[in-house]
Amino acid sequence: FFLFLDDYYICFLIRKRYKFMIYTNYYNSPIGRITMASEGTALIGLWFEGQKYFADSIKEECTEKDLDIFDDTSRWLDIYFRGKEPDFTPKILITGTPFRKSVAEIMLTIPYGKTMTYGEIANVIAKEKGIAKMSAQAVGGAVGHNSISIIIPCHRVVGTNGSLTGYAGGLDKKIQLLKLEKTDKI
């Protein structure tokens, strides 16, 4: 299951639409504080403090709570920030448009320490749909609204010729994540 949120009012909209409570907790990473969000059993959000689109909107509509999913996610992040590839993935819940789900599923296949371009993702989707071409810009929009940063590795998506383009958590964090993974794109 995967979840993508299209609005700044994440918790309010989720609670109103899906009728479940949203819980949050925090992880202090070496490159900044991270907000974790869950509906109780699965991770639905992972954002750097101040990240575009998500983190500023969840404070009032969510309840801070300790949950097993936050323990699992923190363990995953501990391994990741030690410069190692975690050998498990916390349970994640992704919903959204079929297009955003497709982009998320492709991002999940990008190996640790490797990158993929927006155009390459667009080509994979075009091939899956049996069409000649898919817009790399549309892929960029979906990547930019990824609500589960790091675990769904949107930081591994780069521009044409490997150029480092925007990252909702900040380009400085994208660079730090790619350096941590010893990616050759930096």
Give the residues covered by each predicted segment.
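The DNA-recognition helices of helix-turn-helix-type DNA-binding domains
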Residues: 125-128, 146, 171
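Extreme N-terminal basic, low-complexity initiation segments
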Residues: 1-9
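Regulatory, non-catalytic segments
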Residues: 130-148
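Basic nucleic-acid-binding alpha-helical/helix-turn surface characteristic of O6-alkylguanine DNA
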Residues: 9-10, 15-130, 134, 180-186
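Short Lys/Arg-enriched helix C-cap and helix-to-coil transition segments
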Residues: 150-157
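Short glycine/proline- and charge-enriched loop/turn segments
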Residues: 54-57, 158, 171
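…primarily DNA-binding HTH/wHTH and HhH modules…
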Residues: 160-186
